[in-house]
């Protein structure tokens, strides 16, 4: 398959407790059948759960996607997305988007306590092996500086000059879920519908 669940041109969407673990071929950068590599279990959709078009205020919560995938951020100006306590692959080039519709994501992409089961950089754009968010030499890889807190699992270094905030890289933080903590602060409790999804 090509894509999982996404918030497309919508506002205040919650996508939670989704598990996507399809089998298939791992991919390398390129076009056509030459990109297919090895057949494996739990590869996942090319684009995992995420956002597209003018999505605003989406929460992707407690989602598990495949090891050769990554969250979707399919351009045309999505903004203010929280990827909260999710796990799966963190692979370059899986976000998507037409070169005429860049950037992949505008302001306020927040990735909180992400557990990477597999991480990949791209030697063509990642200086010194550090994950790059804005490729100044290409057309397809453009993210405004994100906020990443508590990234852990497979190690990955990020280019500090392209980050709005980077904290606790390599170690999960408390609260484990930023979304739950915000609800608790605003409402005084975590709604039962959310607790039932744990």
Language-model region placement:
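Right-handed parallel beta-helix
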Residues: 1, 9-24, 31-46, 53-69, ...
